[in-house]
Amino acid sequence: MAEPEPPDLLPRDFPDKIIRQTLQHPQNLREFLARVLPEHVDRFDFSQVVPLSREFLTADWRGREADLLFVVPYHGPQGREQDCLIEILTEHQTSPDSSTVLRSLLYASSSWETAWLEWKKRHERGEELRLRTIVCIVLYTGPGTWTAPRSLSELVAGPADLARFGPRLDPIFWELRDQSVDSLLSALGGWPKMLAVMRAGASSVEEFERVFVAALRELEALAGTDRIRWLELVRAVLMWMIRMRPREERPRLTKLAVESQNQQEDRLEMETMYETIYDAAVKQGLDLGRKEGLDL
């Protein structure tokens, strides 16, 4: 397979930006958590998701732009509803970041500190301090295996016989390379279809075409029920194709994308989307990775 064009067409942080922007939609978030926490996902109330800005963090540490924080109500087994903080730390680089586990702790401690300060200001006499449950997920879409520390105990250096005195935090690591393309294609919902195309990005010509077309055909069901989300996910799939596949493959892939849709309106939309994305990236020199307002 010929080498893809230089990555300046869609910059290095493009995968993180795709993940971050699409997960802002509550249904996409739900579909991701269904893969990560299948036994718990139905207890979260995704109609009440609140994205949390990094403004609550300490002034000298604002976290990382690609990290996502959500407050989501959770209905426990006894019917009690409690807010839960979900951290999603996205990583794509070839060399995993050894500070990732530490970031998850800093987010948790900042959230707990905020809750503590609010409690000090407003709590009634006799009311005990209670902190949110934190669910930390590392979403790794890089090409290799995660080799950096997976827990604080691995990160903290020191005598092994003192390790039990250190803090404990064990994020869930969800690695895209461990997911089969077909399991993503067959999963319920639209967001896994986008992940399937990401997963197949470096595959053979034939395999990528198969996954690309299958994902777009499955996504078409959203066009009539949730068109905004359909547009977002299809744009993400087309952008990923532009980033990962060689220039000489694009005309055929664009033709396949158009033909994958049954409705004429959707075919025209697909063709227009590709032209708009490509023209913006190439002719106008638009830096899609750095532009904060990237419209997926």
Kindly label every feature range from the protein language model.
Residues M1-L296:
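Elongated, amphipathic alpha-helical interaction scaffolds
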